[in-house]
Amino acid sequence: CRHFDFMSSMAVDGIVNYGIGDWCAPFDGPAISVNMSTFKAPVALTDTACYYRSARMLSKMSRVLGLDDPYLARSEEIRAALLRNFVDADTGEVAGACQTSDGCVAFHHLLKPQEEARLMERLAERIAQNGWHIDYGILGSKYVLNMLGEYGRTDVIYKMLTREDYPG
Protein backbone atom coordinates (compact mmCIF):
# COMPACT_ATOMS: atom_id res chain seq x y z
CA CYS A 1 0.00 0.00 0.00
CA ARG A 2 2.86 2.41 0.70
CA HIS A 3 4.19 2.17 -2.84
CA PHE A 4 0.70 2.77 -4.22
CA ASP A 5 0.32 5.75 -1.89
CA PHE A 6 3.65 7.08 -3.15
CA MET A 7 2.58 6.67 -6.77
CA SER A 8 -0.71 8.39 -5.93
CA SER A 9 1.23 11.31 -4.47
CA MET A 10 3.21 11.56 -7.74
CA ALA A 11 0.12 11.33 -9.98
CA VAL A 12 -1.31 14.38 -11.68
CA ASP A 13 -4.82 13.79 -13.01
CA GLY A 14 -4.24 10.04 -12.80
CA ILE A 15 -0.95 10.10 -14.72
CA VAL A 16 2.36 9.16 -13.10
CA ASN A 17 5.39 10.60 -14.85
CA TYR A 18 8.07 9.44 -12.48
CA GLY A 19 10.16 6.36 -13.08
CA ILE A 20 12.82 4.78 -15.21
CA GLY A 21 10.88 3.89 -18.32
CA ASP A 22 11.79 1.20 -20.84
CA TRP A 23 15.49 0.92 -20.05
CA CYS A 24 17.98 -0.83 -22.31
CA ALA A 25 16.09 -0.64 -25.59
CA PRO A 26 18.43 -0.67 -28.60
CA PHE A 27 19.24 2.92 -29.47
CA ASP A 28 21.75 5.20 -31.07
CA GLY A 29 23.23 8.02 -29.07
CA PRO A 30 24.65 8.76 -25.64
CA ALA A 31 24.54 6.46 -22.65
CA ILE A 32 21.11 5.44 -21.43
CA SER A 33 21.35 7.46 -18.21
CA VAL A 34 21.40 10.68 -20.21
CA ASN A 35 19.18 9.46 -23.03
CA MET A 36 15.83 8.89 -21.30
CA SER A 37 14.16 11.71 -23.21
CA THR A 38 14.60 9.71 -26.41
CA PHE A 39 12.73 6.62 -25.21
CA LYS A 40 10.10 5.70 -27.78
CA ALA A 41 7.52 4.61 -25.20
CA PRO A 42 6.59 7.60 -23.06
CA VAL A 43 7.77 7.13 -19.49
CA ALA A 44 4.40 8.41 -18.27
CA LEU A 45 2.65 5.64 -20.23
CA THR A 46 4.65 2.79 -18.71
CA ASP A 47 4.62 4.38 -15.23
CA THR A 48 0.87 4.95 -15.30
CA ALA A 49 0.30 1.38 -16.51
CA CYS A 50 2.26 0.12 -13.49
CA TYR A 51 0.18 2.41 -11.26
CA TYR A 52 -2.97 0.90 -12.80
CA ARG A 53 -1.70 -2.64 -12.24
CA SER A 54 -0.94 -1.84 -8.59
CA ALA A 55 -4.48 -0.55 -8.08
CA ARG A 56 -5.90 -3.72 -9.66
CA MET A 57 -3.75 -5.96 -7.45
CA LEU A 58 -4.69 -4.04 -4.30
CA SER A 59 -8.35 -4.31 -5.28
CA LYS A 60 -8.07 -8.07 -5.62
CA MET A 61 -6.22 -8.37 -2.30
CA SER A 62 -8.84 -6.25 -0.54
CA ARG A 63 -11.66 -8.46 -1.80
CA VAL A 64 -9.84 -11.68 -0.87
CA LEU A 65 -9.24 -10.35 2.65
CA GLY A 66 -12.84 -9.16 2.98
CA LEU A 67 -11.79 -5.51 3.31
CA ASP A 68 -13.35 -2.41 1.82
CA ASP A 69 -12.14 -1.99 -1.75
CA PRO A 70 -11.46 1.62 -2.72
CA TYR A 71 -8.94 0.45 -5.31
CA LEU A 72 -11.27 -0.86 -8.01
CA ALA A 73 -12.82 2.56 -8.60
CA ARG A 74 -9.37 4.14 -8.47
CA SER A 75 -8.05 1.66 -11.04
CA GLU A 76 -10.86 2.62 -13.43
CA GLU A 77 -10.02 6.31 -12.97
CA ILE A 78 -6.36 5.56 -13.75
CA ARG A 79 -7.35 3.46 -16.78
CA ALA A 80 -9.56 6.26 -18.12
CA ALA A 81 -6.76 8.82 -17.67
CA LEU A 82 -4.25 6.53 -19.38
CA LEU A 83 -6.51 5.91 -22.36
CA ARG A 84 -7.42 9.59 -22.64
CA ASN A 85 -3.76 10.64 -22.61
CA PHE A 86 -2.03 7.85 -24.53
CA VAL A 87 -4.46 6.08 -26.89
CA ASP A 88 -6.00 7.84 -29.88
CA ALA A 89 -9.75 7.23 -29.57
CA ASP A 90 -10.25 7.25 -33.35
CA THR A 91 -7.31 5.18 -34.59
CA GLY A 92 -6.35 3.15 -31.52
CA GLU A 93 -2.73 4.26 -32.01
CA VAL A 94 -0.77 4.24 -28.76
CA ALA A 95 1.57 7.15 -27.91
CA GLY A 96 5.12 6.34 -28.87
CA ALA A 97 3.98 4.13 -31.78
CA CYS A 98 6.43 1.42 -30.77
CA GLN A 99 6.63 -2.17 -29.63
CA THR A 100 6.77 -1.29 -25.93
CA SER A 101 3.79 1.09 -26.07
CA ASP A 102 1.58 -1.40 -27.91
CA GLY A 103 2.69 -4.27 -25.69
CA CYS A 104 2.14 -2.25 -22.52
CA VAL A 105 -1.46 -1.35 -23.32
CA ALA A 106 -2.22 -4.94 -24.35
CA PHE A 107 -0.42 -6.52 -21.36
CA HIS A 108 -2.49 -4.50 -18.92
CA HIS A 109 -5.69 -5.26 -20.89
CA LEU A 110 -6.66 -1.61 -21.02
CA LEU A 111 -8.73 -1.94 -24.20
CA LYS A 112 -11.89 -3.85 -25.04
CA PRO A 113 -11.06 -7.37 -26.32
CA GLN A 114 -11.70 -6.58 -30.00
CA GLU A 115 -9.62 -3.38 -29.76
CA GLU A 116 -6.83 -5.29 -28.04
CA ALA A 117 -6.87 -7.90 -30.83
CA ARG A 118 -6.48 -5.11 -33.42
CA LEU A 119 -3.64 -3.62 -31.37
CA MET A 120 -1.88 -6.98 -31.35
CA GLU A 121 -2.27 -7.23 -35.14
CA ARG A 122 -0.71 -3.79 -35.41
CA LEU A 123 2.12 -4.84 -33.08
CA ALA A 124 2.90 -7.88 -35.26
CA GLU A 125 2.85 -5.62 -38.35
CA ARG A 126 5.09 -3.08 -36.61
CA ILE A 127 7.61 -5.82 -35.80
CA ALA A 128 7.55 -7.14 -39.38
CA GLN A 129 8.06 -3.61 -40.75
CA ASN A 130 11.07 -3.30 -38.46
CA GLY A 131 12.69 -6.34 -40.07
CA TRP A 132 11.68 -8.60 -37.15
CA HIS A 133 14.10 -6.68 -34.92
CA ILE A 134 13.63 -6.29 -31.19
CA ASP A 135 12.89 -2.66 -30.43
CA TYR A 136 12.12 -2.68 -26.72
CA GLY A 137 13.87 -2.56 -23.38
CA ILE A 138 13.37 -4.18 -20.01
CA LEU A 139 9.66 -3.34 -19.71
CA GLY A 140 8.87 -4.07 -23.33
CA SER A 141 10.44 -7.52 -23.11
CA LYS A 142 7.80 -8.53 -20.57
CA TYR A 143 4.95 -6.87 -22.43
CA VAL A 144 5.74 -7.80 -26.03
CA LEU A 145 6.79 -11.42 -25.60
CA ASN A 146 4.01 -12.30 -23.15
CA MET A 147 1.31 -10.75 -25.31
CA LEU A 148 2.58 -12.24 -28.57
CA GLY A 149 2.53 -15.61 -26.80
CA GLU A 150 -0.96 -15.02 -25.41
CA TYR A 151 -2.19 -14.28 -28.93
CA GLY A 152 -0.49 -17.36 -30.37
CA ARG A 153 2.05 -15.36 -32.36
CA THR A 154 5.03 -17.56 -31.58
CA ASP A 155 5.99 -17.20 -35.25
CA VAL A 156 6.71 -13.52 -34.63
CA ILE A 157 8.62 -14.28 -31.43
CA TYR A 158 10.73 -16.87 -33.25
CA LYS A 159 11.59 -14.46 -36.07
CA MET A 160 12.53 -11.76 -33.57
CA LEU A 161 14.68 -13.94 -31.36
CA THR A 162 16.55 -15.72 -34.15
CA ARG A 163 17.80 -12.60 -35.92
CA GLU A 164 21.55 -12.80 -36.34
CA ASP A 165 22.02 -9.10 -36.99
CA TYR A 166 21.70 -6.35 -34.39
CA PRO A 167 19.42 -6.05 -32.55
CA GLY A 168 18.31 -9.62 -32.49
Regions found by a protein language model. Give the residues of each.
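Active-site core of glycosidic bond-cleaving carbohydrate-active enzymes
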Residues: C1-G168
